[in-house]
Structure formats: structure tokens, C-alpha cells
Amino acid sequence: MRLTALLPLSLALLASPTLQAEELPKAIQQLQAKGAVIKGSFDAPNGLRGYAAEYQNNGLALYLTPDGKHVLVGSLFDEQGKDLSAEPLKKLVYAPMSKEIWAKMEKTAWIADGKDDAPRKVYLFSDPNCPYCNMFWEQARPWVESGKVQLRHIMVGIIREDSPGKSAALLAAKDPAKALHEHEKAGKASKLKALEQVPEAVQQKLAANMALMEEMGLQATPAIFYQDDQGNLQSQQGAPRPELLGKILGKR
């Protein structure tokens, strides 16, 4: 799994333990000082010692030479062409990252679209004025209405001046799921109005959603997150092409 498939993510997003500086060789500490976050170490061939790091929002393999004074940075391949860095980075960097992101999204103020017992959950950062969010809502109807998928809309407001107020109106509705359904079903004819006075509790929910979006480095909607058949976190920016719907939503 590549981090680029997950969209840019802030280093601050992750709270997994890192190796303490005093446990690391000086050469590795020098890279720490340049911003590399060491997530763990792993065995490597020919006397090398591998370290899995996170740097500038990407997983990075570091290889300490046997003398402990030099570091090789990048992928290491064997004579069969196998990338020996891939599995350690997946285990030590990307897997914990996926769990952390999913857990953070679970705690947001999302609006459910579909049955609670649907076997597949899909999160999307959604703006009420976003035509591509509405397009994805339409695309997902067969999966949602059959009970196979629940979409979880993390409401934000970034497209127009009244977007935050409209998201607040949905979050403050007596039945947010019903309000969202009516808004999306109506499309351009939606009569959703922005709240002029937003309750403090709703404002806090919306602010938290916006903060997470910013923390994850996301700049547009819809930003869609789902788990593939192996449980790996994947993402899609924008309304997906029809041939990608099966990957995101599962079997129809």
C-alpha cells in the first residue's frame, strides 16, 4: 500500500509510538533531526539494519551500514527484483497509519446514509454545495438501498460562503439522516438553507470535522475513504469513475 493512495496526511495525525532518540544510532538520529519519524526497525541482509520512517507524509526505508556510521535511504531489492522494503513499511508505517485515520473518522460528527448493520462502511468528507458529492451519492444508491453499504458523511463547508451554514443545518436537523437524504435526492433543486445562528454544540462538531480535514491535508470534496477486501485503507478523491465503484463499495 502506498501513502500516495491515501492522500497527503499530516505527520501530527499519527500517535503511534516511535523509537526514542537515545535508542538509535547517531547516524539515524541525524535523519530524525531532519524530520524523519522513526516507527520501528527491521532485519536487513548483509549486515544492514533497517529502520522504517515517516518523512514528509511518506513511508521511507533507512538502512544503517554495519559500521553504524552511514545510512542508505530508499528501497532495497534482491536479485529476484523483490522490494525488501515494502513489507516492513507496510507493517510499521502504513498499517498503524490506516488504523489511526479510520479511528479518527469514526469519532467525527458524521451523518449516516444507509443501514447501521451494513457490512461495509465508507466515509466521505462532504460539502452540501458539492456537485461531485451528490454524484457519488447517486452512484452509491444500489449498494446503500440494498443494505450492503453505509455511507458516513463527514460534513464540512469549503465550497461556497453558505456551505458551513448548510452543513450546520444538516447536523442540527431533528433527523440529520432524513435531512441529508432529502437534500441529496433533490440535487440542484434542494431547498436546504444555511443556518444564520449556529448552536455552539453544532459549531464545535463542524469545526472538528474541518480540523480533521485540514489535518489530513485534504483540500476538496468528496474525499472518500474505504477499506479494501484485505482491510487496507484506501481513498478516492472526487466522484469515482463507474469502473471503480466495485472497489469502493464492494459487490453490487
Question: Predicted segments — roles?
Answer:
Residues M1-L7:
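Bacterial N-terminal signal peptides that target proteins for export
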Residues P8-L13:
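Hydrophobic helical h-region of N-terminal Sec-dependent signal peptides
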Residues A15-T18:
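N-terminal signal peptide c-region/cleavage motif recognized by signal peptidases
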Residues E22-G50, Y55-L72, S190-R252:
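C-terminal cap of thioredoxin/glutaredoxin-like
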Residues G68-A95:
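A short, surface-exposed interaction/processing loop segment used at functional sites
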Residues Y94-I101, V144-E145, P222:
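C-terminal low-complexity, charged extensions that often adopt amphipathic alpha-helices
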Residues W102-R120:
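A short beta-strand-turn-helix
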Residues A118-P128, N134-V198, E214, L218-Q219, ...:
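Structural alpha/beta surface segment adjacent to cysteine/selenocysteine redox centers
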